[in-house]
Every structure is written in structure tokens, then in C-alpha cells.
């Protein structure tokens, strides 16, 4: 992979976190993501699902800051993202899954439903909507949501989303 391709892939991942587009990742981006999801799915912030989503967003931010905010200014710059989030997590993808899981679980609950075992599941269409409201382009959201439905039953389980998100942010590979 040439450096231009690598830079482009990193830029996409950075932009996915930088929800307000001000060129750094901070707590406000995670809160913005939570707010967008709640609005899209008509869920109030002041309910169990809404609170779980904000709690998950805060945990995700704290985890991201712990890994990538090298200078401790409560902002993750592009340089910090590349050096910390991408390089360090590449060696430990399980760590990313761990910090992202509470947010993803809560997001899927907002978009879908909670199973009796506490895990969450959503339809392919709902996951596509969630990805679009978080800034993914239409075709990207559609392709990504479709590929998450590995058994083709029209629904996507929490574990599949966590694994896919962890892989997306920790494994930067050339296009096939
Ligand atoms: Ca931002
Ligand atoms: Ca920083």
C-alpha cells in the first residue's frame, strides 16, 4: 500500500470519529454521535436506552483518550490518532473492542432491540440508517450493513458489529 492510500484510509477513520469536523476528536464528538443516533431513532436521552448510549459514548471517549491523547489536552489530533489509536491498537485489537463495546451495544439497542441475554440486535436496514446518520456515505453504509449480516437473515448481532468496527479501526490493509 502506498503512503497516499494509507493516508486516505486513515483520513476516513479519523473523520468517522470527528463527528463535528473540527479536525480533532474529543468528548463532544462522542456526545454528538450519541445525540444523532437518538434523534434518528426517536429515542429520548432521558430513558434507559438513552442513558446507556451516553454512558457508552463517555467510556468510548475515555478509552480513546487513554490510548491516543498523548499530551493529555483532552483532544486527539490526527497525529495522535495515527500514532496512538491506529498503531497501538493494531497490536491489540481486543482492546479496541473492549472500549467500543458498551457504546456499540447501546447503539444497537437504540436502533434495534435487546435480547433476553442482554446482547443487542438490529435489522440490516436499521444499522444502515445508523451508519448514515454517523456520516457514512450511502453506498458505504449499505455495503457495510449488508456485509455484517453474515447468515443473511436480515439482522445483525452486537458481536458482529463489535468485531467489524474493531477490525475497521485497527487493521489498515490495501484494497482487495
Ligand atoms: Ca471533533
Ligand atoms: Ca492531545
Language-model regions, residue ranges each:
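Short helix-capping and inter-helix turn/linker motifs at the boundaries of alpha-helical repeat units
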Residues: 1-5, 55-56, 98-99, 134-136
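The feature marks the first
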Residues: 1-50
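Amphipathic regulatory helices of Ca2+-sensor modules
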Residues: 25-45, 76-91, 121-135, 157-171
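Well-ordered, non-transmembrane segments within structured domains
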Residues: 81, 85, 97-104
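Solvent-exposed, charged amphipathic helical/linker segments at domain boundaries
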Residues: 90-98
